[in-house]
Amino acid sequence: VCCGGFPCQPFSIAGLRRGFEDTRGTLFFNIANIVKQKIDSGIPPKVLFLENVKGLKTHMKGETLKTILATLDELGYAYNYDVLNAKYFGVPQNRERLFIVAWYKDIVKATTFKFPYGIAPDGSTIYEKSKDLGDKVIKTKVSDIFEPEDSIDSYYTISDRLWIGHQERKKRNKANGKGFGYSLFNENSVYSSTISARYWKDGSEILIDQSDKGLNPRKLTPTEAGRLQGYRIIGNGWKYPENADNQNYNSDNLEFHIVVPRKEAYHQFGNSVAIPVIKRLSKEIVEQLLKI
């Protein structure tokens, strides 16, 4: 299995003709070139597992995705793609990502790949993308990831100056029709917005309400940021969601430890994939494409 992620912006530079040569200068070209070399060497990857932002579907009016899919077809791969949301896989985060699963037609005789769209309360996989999907999946709350209140340093409570700045900026953006600004959540919120690599700067995309204590909002701690992506970072007062993944993988017993500075931890977690989504997708790849 060849896994990869790549930015879509470089496709805007050269213009598109929908083919392998047209991907030059992009990170996707490097992925495609590695695959081509493996094919030429007689050891083609059976499966390609690619991840990108949801916006890839509409980037350059869909031409970027068409070029990528045409390249996969040119290399001899059948494929399926769809957008999955982490909030349906047992983590309280609204994080949509586009996944492409491709299989080498000369080796893997599958006719299609069925995506998992969520995890049910009993741990089973949901394969139907229905309008009521949110009612069928494992329930979460933002407080599922919280560290004990008495263990959270005052460092994470934002300053008066920053809080006033967030509020003023949101007012201006709303008046200008931009719709951007801070997002405030509490312990009963079903899920948060998407955490990004820039979270370390001001935490504006996910702030935790502390008005009941007479305090300004706070940022997530690095541990909470990791848990939001599904990392099993153990702490006092927190339990790993039992049904987030019940497949009995050995990795379920692994505990993650943050060994980098706070800023780097935020950056890495913001750039990460949501672990439960990847684990469930990986299981489906094995069952549907590698075992047949």
Question: Can you say where each PLM-predicted feature lies in the sequence?
Answer:
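Class I S-adenosyl-L-methionine
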Residues: 9-194, 198-200
